[in-house]
Swiss-Prot record:
This is LexA repressor. Disulfide bonds: none annotated. The active site is at S129, K167. The gene is lexA. Belongs to the peptidase S24 family. Homodimer. It is an enzyme of class 3 (hydrolase). NCBIfam families: lexA. Represses a number of genes involved in the response to DNA damage (SOS response), including recA and lexA. In the presence of single-stranded DNA, RecA interacts with LexA causing an autocatalytic cleavage which disrupts the DNA-binding part of LexA, leading to derepression of the SOS regulon and eventually DNA repair. GO terms for biological process: DNA repair; DNA replication; negative regulation of DNA-templated transcription; proteolysis; SOS response.
Length: 208
């Protein structure tokens, strides 16, 4: 009985992988029922729960269909993870704003665990204004493209002069504040600001 249940779990995992590969999103529970020969949705939910417990699947609550196969899940299926790459768009200052370079000439490999790579890009930081947030001169930040931000988010922002900077974002009553994480530096106040993206990760190829 245990072997049969395990075989069904692998069938569920394999079908989820196939649907994601073919369509870009996982199947519904009822579609899984039909595909693997199960009549009860609760049985499928049970298999999914056990696959999550074993580390073969994970849930992303930010997505409507939240199932994702982990690197461990791909490994047990014998599938080699596809190496993902994101564009490196140049240098952005973490001190005074400079023009951001948006011509991708290089690409940076990222782990399979980092999803939505089509919405990510990388910039190299120049300056010391974000050191209290752990972002140092020469670091490369991974940025998710988005045009909005919440107070306290670390963002790449552009002003009306098309100058970009890495700062912590705050919306105040009559203006926007781009706050450095360095006690020796002053915030930047703007009437208008364009958000290019939110910093979601960091890569450093050196140690201090």
């Amino acid at each position: 009985m245990a072997k049969l249940a395990k075989n069904k779990q692998m069938a569920v995992l394999n079908y989820i992988h196939k649907q994601v590969e073919d369509h870009g999103y996982p199947p519904t529970v009822r579609e899984i029922c039909s595909a693997v020969g199960l009549s009860s949705t609760s049985t499928v939910h049970g298999h999914i729960s056990r696959l999550i417990e074993q580390g073969f699947l994970q849930k992303d609550p930010s997505k409507p269909r939240a199932l994702e196969i982990t690197p461990k899940g791909l490994d047990i299926l014998g599938v080699k993870p596809i190496q993902k790459e994101i564009p490196m768009l140049g240098v952005v200052t973490a001190g005074q704003p400079i023009l951001a370079v948006e011509n991708a000439t290089e690409f940076f490999p990222i782990p399979p665990s980092i999803q939505d790579n089509n919405d990510l890009f990388m910039l190299t930081i120049r300056g010391t204004s974000m050191i209290k947030a752990g972002i140092f001169n020469g670091d490369q930040v991974i940025v998710r493209k988005q045009s909005t931000a919440k107070n306290g988010d670390i963002v790449i922002a552009m002003n009306d002069d098309n100058e970009a900077t890495c700062k912590r974002f705050y919306k105040e009553k009559t203006r926007f504040r781009l706050q450095p994480e360095n006690d020796t530096m002053e915030p930047i106040f703007l009437d208008n600001v364009k958000i290019l993206g939110k910093v979601v990760g960091l890569f450093r190829d050196h140690i201090f």
